[in-house]
Amino acid sequence: MMTTRSCAEWCVERCQNAGQYARTALQAQLIAKRIELLSETVRKAQIVTLLVNPTNRYTDTETEILYGGARSLNLQLHVVRATSVAEFDAAFKEIKDLRTEALLVSADLFLHSQREKLVSLANSYALPTIYPWREYVTAGGLMSYGPSLIDASRLIGIYSGKILRGASPAELPVEQNTKVEFVINLKTAKAQGLAFSIPLLGRADEVIE
C-alpha cells in the first residue's frame, strides 16, 4: 500500500513524466512561444540569454530547443547557469557582461522558489525578462508564458485522491495540464521603458497594472 508521501511523489513524477515525447513536445511549444513573445516585446534585441539550473535533468533539452528557436529569429543565444542563491549575483553580472538585451528564465522549481530574488535582480538591471509562470509576474516580473501551477496542483490532488481510494497507479490515465497563461505586468514595463503593442496586449490572459 502506498503511503501518503510515496503517493504524492508518484503523482508529481507522473504529472511531470507522462511520456518523454509528450513532455518534450509541450516543452518545445512553450519555449518557442516564450522566445517569440520576448522578441516581439523587445524588437531590437539581438542577444538573449537563458538562465538555467544545470542540475535540472531537462536543462539540456530546453537549451537545445531554445537554440533552434533563437536561430529561427536570428538571435544570438547565451546560457548562464546558477545552482544556488549564492551564485545569482555572479550570474547576473555574467548576463550583463554578455551584453544581454533580453532574458529568459528556465522552468525550474528551484529558480521558481527564489522568484522574488530573481525578479529583483532582473529589474535592477532593467532587463526585459520572460518567466515560465505567472507567480514571477505577480512578484514584479515583466511577463510570463506557461502552464498554470494551480491547475498542476489540482491534477496532483486528483491523482492522490484516486490512489488513496484504492485505484491502481498503473491503470490511471495520464492527464496533461493544458491551461497556458500569458501574463503581463504594465508597471514593470513602464519602469523599463517598454511598451507592449496593442495586439500583444490583446493576447494576454491577464494584464497587471
Give residue spans per PLM region.
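Short hydrophobic alpha-helices and adjacent helix-cap/hinge residues
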Residues: 1-209
